[in-house]
Amino acid sequence: MVQYLGLNIVSVAARKGSKNLSKFVDKYNVRSSYDSWSNMIKNENLDAIIIALAGIKRLKIKKSAEILKSDEFMPAAGQGIIVVQSLKKNKIINKILSNLEITNVRHQATAERATLKILEGNCNSSIATLSSIENNTLTLSARIYSAHGKYMIEASNDGPISQSIKIGENVGKQLIKKGAQKILESCS
């Protein structure tokens, strides 16, 4: 739970709880269902919960007060990307799946995952990434937050989409030079 301007706010993910929270004094993470979150708001004197927009839409929640902008509140690597895995030997399924693939999304996911790999990050790491493609140029930004949001480092890189792995690795290396390992170790 975090306290901000006298409000008690719960985040359901470590990355969400760490982001932009240097002004908050305390927090805790909750992994449970929307019903549990709703009950927590009612029963534990909580004022708000930070949850993903996908969850709000899926659950058809109409009470959301604000949708946070992705450049202010960066998502986790690969957030919102649907991945389907199949066996190499299953040629029929692979042909069907190849028709569904969006090439730009693959390049974005590849760059974001390359950053995570360099940082040895996972879904519990307080690492955020945001990528975009315009005119065949991939731009990737990433941030790492300390456990309570007191510290944040960021890096970005861009280049041709064909270099998505290199772009992601460059961002990861920039973050390491800025102290990423120390921040990530303090969060675990």
Q: Where do the language-model regions lie?
A:
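Short beta-strand-centered segments that line the small-molecule binding cleft or hinge
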Residues: M1
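Short, well-ordered beta-strand elements
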Residues: L7-A13
